[in-house]
Amino acid sequence: TYVIAQPCVDVKDKACIEECPVDCIYEGQRSLYIHPDECVDCGACEPVCPVEAIFYEDDTPEEWKDYYKANVEFFDDLGSPGGASKLGLIERDHPFVAGLPPQNA
């Protein structure tokens, strides 16, 4: 599974959303999240991210390892909607992301 880490917070470029063939990248308030059950591990999202925020789970830098758990837990209440485009913006973030200081200040 791919993970979106800290460089995405408060940026949300969304190039990855356009590239994803299975519509598994969801938009939270401050960050984007990859649904671990819907992602097919194709990797199309990784090279198009202009801030290099997307990593394969095993390749996530040590300082951003907590983002894997945040990506998984973000979907605890949502379940598996089966496509991000029909949901649009989700007006919340994982508490780990929500608690970060503003990244674009």
Curated annotation (Swiss-Prot):
InterPro entries given in the database record: 4Fe4S_Fe-S-bd, 4Fe4S_Fe_S_CS, 7Fe_ferredoxin, FdxA_Actino, RnfB_subfamily
Pfam families per UniProt: Fer4
Domain 4Fe-4S ferredoxin-type span(s) in chain numbering: 30-59
Keywords: 3Fe-4S, 4Fe-4S, Electron transport, Iron, Iron-sulfur, Metal-binding, Repeat, Transport
Cofactor: record remark: Binds 1 [4Fe-4S] cluster. Binds 1 [3Fe-4S] cluster.
Record keyword Iron-sulfur present: yes
Names of required cofactors: [4Fe-4S] cluster; [3Fe-4S] cluster
Any one GO molecular-function label of the UniProt entry: metal ion binding
Binding residues annotated for [4Fe-4S] cluster, in chain numbering: C20, C39, C42, C45
Keyword presence, Metal-binding: yes
Residues annotated as binding [3Fe-4S] cluster: C8, C16, C49
Matching PANTHER family: FERREDOXIN, OXIDOREDUCTASE
Role, per record: Ferredoxins are iron-sulfur proteins that transfer electrons in a wide variety of metabolic reactions. Putative electron transport protein for the cytochrome P-450SOY system from the same organism.
Record protein name field: Ferredoxin
Species of provenance: Streptomyces griseus
